[in-house]
UniProtKB/Swiss-Prot annotation:
Protein name: Deferrochelatase
Signal sequence residues: 1-35
Oligomeric and partner information: Homodimer. Part of a ferrous iron transporter composed of EfeU, EfeO and EfeB.
UniProt-listed GO biological process terms: iron import into cell
CC terms in the record's Gene Ontology section: cytosol; periplasmic space
Catalytic activity of the protein: heme b + 2 H(+) = protoporphyrin IX + Fe(2+)
Keyword terms: Heme, Iron, Lyase, Metal-binding, Oxidoreductase, Periplasm, Peroxidase, Signal
Coiled-coil features, chain-numbered ranges: none
Native species: Shigella sonnei (strain Ss046)
Annotated cofactor note: Binds 1 heme b (iron(II)-protoporphyrin IX) group non-covalently per subunit.
Protein role: Involved in the recovery of exogenous heme iron. Extracts iron from heme while preserving the protoporphyrin ring intact.
Compartments where found: Periplasm
Domain of life according to the entry: Bacteria
Entry binding sites for heme b: G236, T237, A238, H329, N334, P335, R336, R347
Length: 423
């Protein structure tokens, strides 16, 4: 006797019987299966994670010091606003949408079915906050002649120029504004983007977009675990403590003593780099060489010659680089000197995977994002130290830009960029 399987293919009854026996045997070999039913399986969210939310109003925007969520998107836009009043309308509208999307609520009902639906519907009838943050930053080009904002441009904001190892694609660089959208799940990120685009058809045009991720279990650790990049190394071990308010005032936020325009206080310089990895080449590189290039043990993340990930390397006792090479990534990025302390920055990077290149290689890498109170002392100084590092053979920056993340929204009567546009 024969039966048809789920694909409509005839299957002998004996084979079906063996499948059933195998399934029972497998179930019998897992005595803890019932005990695990109440727990979240790896890669899934706990039942209440969709209701997790970040405060929207405050001195600073969320999404900068916020522990990294699992899903992320960078979207750069060209602004279509015709004048300063139109730009204010855009920023007010973005503030309204961000406030709703990040706090959650019922999806709007469409009163007339002959009209387009008011919501994409991809989250269902209730839009859960899902730990969503949307961080708005402005680029150098927003301060051109269109809106009369040139005198108010942040002092260190500039157009990203090419470093020696860069292979920049103009279609993936710069932007009048940049949104960093992060949430526990990717569908929430996509829903937020579509909502924003739907509400701003005459004000914004997408320039470029990239989506990123970190491991779900790393995200759920709320900063206690370090993300691992697609080269297999921990990424962000030496980050300053984002929960230390005094340190963040020194490292991340623009303050009143910096001689910046007054409206920038509470904001932060944002550097974004889209970095493609040559993963096939890297995977054929000996482990010892990989570790020498980074200066860390690949499995533990510890500096070479040390035991634990967060051990502080002692470069003074290794002046010739016999343990940690002089051109290793960690030694160049942070030499641990009194002078280099001023170049600290808060990294918030994500991995990306985007199909294959035209040459048939895997297109994957890092969406590097960092925040600092001074772009020149922070990212630009660090990147100049990294020029010529051994890692350059395996990585290729292809896009990004420099932006300024606006200060936060005080309350429901305020809006993003209000201090800038009221000058």
């Amino acid at each position: 006797m024969q039966y048809k399987d789920e694909n409509g293919v005839n299957e002998p009854s004996r084979r079906r019987l063996l499948k059933g026996i195998g399934a029972l045997a497998l179930a019998g070999s897992c005595p803890v299966a019932h005990a695990q039913k109440t727990q979240s399986a790896p890669g899934t969210l706990s039942p209440d994670a969709r209701n997790e939310k970040q405060p929207f109003y405050g001195e600073h925007q969320a999404g900068i010091l916020t522990p990294q969520q699992a899903a992320m998107m960078l979207v750069a836009f060209d602004v279509l606003a015709s004048d300063k009043a139109d730009l204010e309308r855009l920023f007010r509208l973005l503030t309204q949408r961000f406030a709703f999307l990040t706090q959650g609520g019922a999806a709007p009902e469409t009163p007339n079915p002959r009209l387009p639906p008011l919501d994409s519907g991809i989250l269902g009838g209730y839009i859960a906050p899902d730990n969503l943050t949307i961080t708005l930053s402005v680029g150098h080009s927003l301060f051109d002649e269109r809106f009369g904002l040139a005198p108010q441009m942040p002092k260190k904001l500039q157009k990203m120029t090419r470093f020696p190892n860069d292979s920049l694609d103009a279609a993936l660089c710069h932007g009048d504004v940049l949104l960093q959208i992060c949430a526990n799940t990717q569908d929430t990120v996509i829903h937020a983007l579509r909502d924003i685009i739907k509400h701003t058809p005459d004000l914004l045009s997408v320039r470029w977009k990239r989506e990123g991720f970190i491991s779900d279990h790393v995200s759920r650790s709320k900063g206690k675990e370090t993300p691992i990049n697609l080269l297999g190394f921990k990424d962000g071990t030496a980050n300053p403590d984002s929960q230390n308010d005094k340190l963040m005032q020194k490292v991340v936020w623009v303050t009143a003593d910096q001689q910046e325009p007054a409206w920038t206080i509470g904001g932060s310089y944002q550097a974004v780099r889209l970095i493609q990895f040559r993963v096939e080449f890297w995977d054929r590189t000996p482990l010892k060489e990989q570790q020498t290039i980074f200066g860390r043990d690949k499995q533990t993340g510890a500096p070479l010659g040390m035991q634990h990930e967060h051990d502080v390397p002692d470069y003074a006792s290794d002046p010739e680089g016999k343990v940690i090479a002089l051109d290793s990534h960690i030694r160049l990025a942070n030499p641990r000197t009194a002078e280099s302390e001023s170049s600290l920055m808060l990294r918030r990077g994500y991995s990306y995977s985007l199909g294959v290149t035209n040459s048939g290689q895997l297109d994957m890498g890092l969406l590097f994002v960092c925040y600092q109170h001074d772009l020149e002392k922070g990212f630009l100084t660090v990147q100049k130290r990294l020029n010529g590092e051994a890692l350059e053979e395996y990585v290729k920056p292809i896009g990004g830009g420099y932006f300024f993340s606006l200060p936060g929204v005080k309350d429901a009567n305020d809006y993003l960029g209000s201090a800038l546009l009221r000058v």
